[in-house]
């Protein structure tokens, strides 16, 4: 480790000791009693001096934090490198599934020279943007800073720091999810695909093509969407990614629903062998369009049973069930637009979709919000919504 890097490590460890001391509401004199002078601890917390191994070990022990020896540090370094390798070669959703493994190592990482990596990796797992330890940013290396910039949505800075396929893919994915700029999203994703192909990163290639297809779907460009989904489907089959194939098929059929091709969509969703909640949601909407009330209600009930074991209100599955209940309410109440209970279901669900899901989910439900505004003669609100979502509003 270079001298300036070692100094940065001491500063970060000092910050950790200070944070843990304050968390426990301890004074400096209380922490360092019998170990070192208060002035010495003060300099340690400010990162102004190198800490002797013996004193550091005693301070960490008093704070009930683990002491990491050289051998364990090497093991942790290998773990951190493996984490970055997986992060940079897979879709972010796959990386997030490793959170439990990270949690097992977290405390040791925070007590080691890898504290900066611990902060950054935890920020990825927790989807933090601006909650990085105060004062830490100036000690980050280019890789750590690039990941932080990506989390903060400072996309060009992230790519400049680390121009790898993953960064281009994530930049495009973020722009797609927020609906900010589909043209830029597609440009980033195409570059990410090309770079991933050069390096043989098949999963990133697949992810880029799916998201490009999603961008075209949200813009209702069916021909371009179909081309991208066909490419993605070939890649998914070659990689034996059967679950991803289901996602592609769902996205395609959902676009048909949004464009009012209910017969085509019904033929697909009614034949899905093991439907997910969102498959049943779209099936219920198709049934609603065709007046198949009983079949639509049964689809929603099935979706509700699938989500009944979750008790976390922030769980994505619970939000999907809320979307299904909107359809059920319309199926069971002919004059739903006149009923206050429908309003209580519609608007909270719509706000959650905007906050927690890719923009396409909210766009899909815009017609139902417009329908309610129009019925209540709230034309100003309806106009503002049309202005915001432009020409990409689905057919009702």
Question: What is the predicted function of each stretch?
Answer:
Residues 89, 122, 129, 152, ...:
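Structural motif corresponding to the intra-repeat A-B loop/turn of tetratricopeptide repeats
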Residues 117, 140, 147, 166, ...:
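Residue register of alpha-helical TPR repeats
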Residues 24-43:
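Short alpha-helical DNA-recognition segment
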Residues 52-70:
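DNA major-groove recognition helix of helix-turn-helix/homeodomain DNA-binding modules
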């Amino acid at each position: 480790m270079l001298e300036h890097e070692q100094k940065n490590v001491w500063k970060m460890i000092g910050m950790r000791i200070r944070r843990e001391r304050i968390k426990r509401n301890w004074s400096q004199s209380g922490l360092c009693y019998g170990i070192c002078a208060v002035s010495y601890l003060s300099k340690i917390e400010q990162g102004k001096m190198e800490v002797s191994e013996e004193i550091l070990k005693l301070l960490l022990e008093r704070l009930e934090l683990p002491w990491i020896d050289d051998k364990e540090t090497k093991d942790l370094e290998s773990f951190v490198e493996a984490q970055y390798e997986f992060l940079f070669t897979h879709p972010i959703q796959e990386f997030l599934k490793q959170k439990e493994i990270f949690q097992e190592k977290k405390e040791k990482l925070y007590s080691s020279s890898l504290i900066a990596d611990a902060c950054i990796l935890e920020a990825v797992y927790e989807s933090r943007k601006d909650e990085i330890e105060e004062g830490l940013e100036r000690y980050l290396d280019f890789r750590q800073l690039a990941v932080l910039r990506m989390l903060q949505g400072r996309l060009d800075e992230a790519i400049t720091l680390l121009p790898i396929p993953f960064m281009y893919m994530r930049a495009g994915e973020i722009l797609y999810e927020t609906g900010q700029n589909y043209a830029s999203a597609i440009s980033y994703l195409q570059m990410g695909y090309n770079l991933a192909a050069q390096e043989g990163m098949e999963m990133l290639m697949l992810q880029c093509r799916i998201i490009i297809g999603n961008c075209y779907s949200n813009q209702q460009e069916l021909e371009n969407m179909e081309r991208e989904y066909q490419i993605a489907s070939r890649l998914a089959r070659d990689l034996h990614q059967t679950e991803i194939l289901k996602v592609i098929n769902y996205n395609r059929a959902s676009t048909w629903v949004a464009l009012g091709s209910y017969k085509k969509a019904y033929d697909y969703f009614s034949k899905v062998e093991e439907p997910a909640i969102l498959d049943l949601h779209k099936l219920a909407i198709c049934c609603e369009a065709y007046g198949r009330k009983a079949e639509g209600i049964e689809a929603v009930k099935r979706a509700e049973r699938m989500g009944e074991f979750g008790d976390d209100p922030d769980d994505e599955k619970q939000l999907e069930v809320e979307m299904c209940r909107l359809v059920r309410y319309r199926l069971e109440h002919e004059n739903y637009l006149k009923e206050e209970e429908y309003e209580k279901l519609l608007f909270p669900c719509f706000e959650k979709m905007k906050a927690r899901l890719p923009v396409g989910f909210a766009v899909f439900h815009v017609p139902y919000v417009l329908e309610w505004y129009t019925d209540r003669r709230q034309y100003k609100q309806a106009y503002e919504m049309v202005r915001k979502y432009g020409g990409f509003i689905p057919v009702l």
